[in-house]
Amino acid sequence: MANNFALREMKLNNGMVDSLNINLLPKEACHDAMMLKTKRMLTASSKRNSATGQKLPFLIRQRKDRIKEMETEFSQSFPPGPPKTQSFFRSSFRNEHFSSASNNDPESFHCAIGPVLVLAQFFGVLPVSGVLRPTPLKMKFVKFSFLTFYAASITATVLVMAILSIIHMIRTLNAKTFAVKGGIAAAMSGAMFYGNCMMGLILFFWLSPRWVTLQRDWRSMEQFIDSNKMQRPKLRWRLYAISSTILFLAVIEHILSIAVNAEKHDYKKGSENATFQDFLQIYCENSHAFILDTVAYNFALGMLIFIVSKLATFTWNFTDVFVMMVATGLAERYKMLNKDVMNSTSKHRNAIDWSGYREDYAALSCMVKKVDSDIAPIILLSFANNLYFICLQLLNGLSKSENSILDNVYFFGSFIFLVGRTVTVTLLTSRINDQSKLVLPALYNCSASTYNVETERLIYLLTTDEIALTGLRFFSITRNFMLANAFTKYTCRWLVQL
């Protein structure tokens, strides 16, 4: 104990910032990460913007928090637990007067995902203003605004379609339905499609005010890690490639769907039936028969069905795209951090800032947990939706005995697109878990001259903290989950055949 108090006194006299104890309780791990890096944040922030004299809110509380930390005893018997999100984000920069040149970084996640979110807002998704502003401090969710009213109107329209679909399902789903080939799919497909899209719009509406806070916390994490002059990930082209590829394939798949449902339309110019009204009626009767069983067809209803189906289709595809982009933003941060650690260990540097690396990994771990708490319902909806519609496509393919060439092209194209989209969202999301463990071999093999107690703490953090996005904690998205998901679909396929 005498040595412990002597060591603590020596650190106090030297004024060291990293005088925190090793035996921090788990609930203090994230706060520990912010405390230890205060000096580095001040230096980097002053270099980026010398004109501002303002500080992050957590720097103002630095002295009081440091005094509380000094009261703990030095001990190695209680290693630190995995970080939690609350302490870290309590000190995030929510001060609206804070400004920094790094806020204008075009490769920040907020700036990279902004244009994609603007496209989504045309379809009533995530009504948050300021998504194209250079800093998330300019973002806000206003309850009474045009964006909110527009999104609520689209959600209400999809809700009406979902109610009509559910009424049809209740009327037609009976014992005879199970005996008819393809009867279950005909009875439930409309209700499941519009019900899924309605839930997606509601969840994005629920996420909107949380998205503002999440983006500010995300930017705080980026500045926290970037203050170490670490290489930043190039996010813009990755997010653009993911969104444009998936949405382009979705457009092709939907065009094939329209062509299949309007196959009986006479496209000859001289024909009496070669009109848009005739095309619209044929399309609605084939694709939305479950609606027309409840409501008589007219041109206005046909236009409503045609427009709402496009809005719902976008939401159906964007749910997966959104999860992919968020997961890519986190995984790329881990990738850059791992690269920097591996470069340091491979060069056998005598002085490696293991404490700084541990703080960065702790901050990133906190960010993953914060993201998971906000988008977990959307992840659950995404995977449940993919599972159902893949099984539905299998059922439709096995039920139809006489198919045209266009039907076969649409079936195989749609099925391949669904499976590919599901595999892609699983692989991209599981990268977070993969990247969080990727640096461990380099830590195990680091030289004895660079290995210290901070290295051990970092190893403990990475091995014990489970870093992954989840579906409301029902499942964690890892590569093993993809195998389990594939086995589930394979089982459903055989059940459908029986």
Labelled PLM ranges:
Residues 456, 460:
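Long, aromatic- and glycine/proline-rich binding clefts that accommodate carbohydrate-like moieties
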Residues 2-27, 37-43, 47-432, 449, ...:
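Membrane-embedded alpha-helical segments and the immediately adjacent membrane-proximal loops
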Residues 432-454:
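C-terminal hydrophobic structural anchor segments
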